[in-house]
């Protein structure tokens, strides 16, 4: 087909292409015509930059479509993207990159879908179709990434005149964004707007969710009078300083102005108004400080107030402190008095452990308050928290930390509010008020973090008697929680319940969302029969181990039993039955392992090998594998790293699509081999295959399936070996290594299947009536001269087969 390529100069180039051509091929054709090297070309279609490894059909580029050619400026530039958690991502970009391209790069690095990303620069939200240069984003600029919470909400803004404005916002919108929306509606410049909520002035860089502003909340809009106001600051010597300020100035700003006038460092200043010490992060308006108010300046004298610290031995220590002292300072004072190093001290007040960077006033610790000192056992311990995306967070904790403390540490690291966190250990959800030691959580234990999705859903549980139970659950509920709900309804103890979904037994510690169980899904409940059975495990040395098991035991359970008997760690065990490697999450009954069956135990050699997986975006993933790993195992590892479900992955090596049940060694995949990962487009399509007998076979395929794959599907359905199959479409025989899209085979196309007979061959004879006859023949020994009698015999054969054939010879 023909397509057009339009340059920025207005010139249009015509190219002859096929839908199966890659973008790389198209760039090569442009180079042939125009002499522009491919690495300087960027092709745009429908507002998207096209990736080299994808095909024209991937982007639905059809005949006479027009692509836009943008020249890649040599060098590009780096920009930074800062997340709300404080993490900074570095991206290689060009000024001509669209915001959509930038979001795609962030997805490649962080796995965040573009539709959940909002990018902010200079207080403005960036639009997908615009470029970096449109926003004057230059090298080393910093963008801010805000996650788009699904849904949005309405809030109200009330002015001093009584008018109420309705705004469509998201919790992640910054105050600056909100002011821009008000400007769009009312024409009031943002720098003249002050927004108040719950008595506080809102700061531009913070988000609505930072202030817990929820749907239908009402903000108050106050216009900022140009020029500000005067206040006075009186020192203990009686001197009065005059300052020009605004109600929205923070106490920190005021101290800076005092430093400018008087040279007193801010950390030595304490400002008092109406008998209260003013905190740095608050504003003058927070304290109702108005024009011509007088503040009192007190120099921070070493001393302040007394507090008490009580040790576990009952000893009480008296300390001289100030409300602005940090917990770190207090620990240093305790070290001075008692010789206990700060890293071994834990201070408790009102039941909470105090954090080093916070101040006494942050915790409302006042004069003569009593803190409790607990000695930190040397080093504490590390635990790991694994999220559903596969990310693992490391935390420094102590056995006496509460679950609430742990959630606070996760919030500090990841920015996830505690009320959205659910922590799971050993299949149990952990309660806020309990400690790690209450749950026997020890060093290097792994907790699982599940985000609490708002709302909940209904699912159904069907028993073998046909009864259906309805349960109210959340996607983040564990299977153990679900079994407890079933016990509440039906009285069946959890240890007698086995839950099945999509043919798999569900494990206690996993969640409903782990298994993609959605609203109104149906689980099947099977009762666990008491009793069990014996199986045998044979090692390579010939030793046979006897195990007591149940059909519902997982392979993981079996490995644990082997470890108990033989001391071999589960991660070094590979169990084989009927020639297949058994997967940890499956059960014995899944593999039809019955009483007195024999499994074979192979030790997993340490080290394995590395292979690489290259995606269509050019990203390369490194995996640690073993030759005996199945393709299914490899896909699971890719899911752990990249979050791509196995059923959307297709792996290609040496031009062949790899089958789940086969191993890497089956395909001769060795260390440092590179596999290619193609994403399986959702939906696929149906095609028909018509045999010479008139039978029509229906196949589920994808445009990217190779002819070899199609033949394998035919073998699965009809038992015909691929090497005996010849597929015909549009009069052409299809080649194994090509794909359906290469031949423009679309949904509901019909292929013709011809059997390849060993030794001979088939030919077709078309009659004048249009009928086609198939003949089994052998190649002539002498193809240059065909004897007349051979011709006569051949045509007589044809005449017998089809009397309507108009056959003649000379």
From Swiss-Prot:
Family matches, as Gene3D superfamilies: Phosphatidylinositol 3-kinase Catalytic Subunit, Chain A, domain 1 (3.10.20.90)
UniProt keyword terms in alphabetical order: ADP-ribosylation, Cytoplasm, Isopeptide bond, Membrane, Mitochondrion, Mitochondrion outer membrane, Nucleus, Phosphoprotein, Repeat, Ubl conjugation
Modified residues (Phosphoserine): 65, 141
Residue positions, PTM ADP-ribosylglycine: 76
Nucleus is among the record's keywords: yes
Key word Phosphoprotein present: yes
Organism superkingdom: Eukaryota
Residue ranges of domain Ubiquitin-like in the record: 1-76, 77-152, 153-228, 229-304, 305-380, 381-456, 457-532, 533-608, 609-684, 685-760
GO cellular component: cytoplasm; mitochondrial outer membrane; nucleus
GO BP term (any one): ubiquitin-dependent protein catabolic process
Site (Essential for function): 144
UniProt cross-link Glycyl lysine isopeptide (Lys-Gly) (interchain with G-Cter in ubiquitin), position: 6, 11, 27, 29, 33, 48, 63
GO molecular function: protein tag activity; structural constituent of ribosome; ubiquitin protein ligase binding
Extra information: Ubiquitin is encoded by 4 different genes. Uba52 and Rps27a genes code for a single copy of ubiquitin fused to the ribosomal proteins eL40 and eS31, respectively. UBB and UBC genes code for a polyubiquitin precursor with exact head to tail repeats, the number of repeats differ between species and strains. For the sake of clarity sequence features are annotated only for the first chain, and are not repeated for each of the following chains.
Protein family (similarity comment): Belongs to the ubiquitin family.
Protein name: Polyubiquitin-C
Organism per entry: Rattus norvegicus (Rat)
Lineage, highest ranks first: Eukaryota, Metazoa, Chordata, Craniata, Vertebrata
Gene designation per UniProt: Ubc
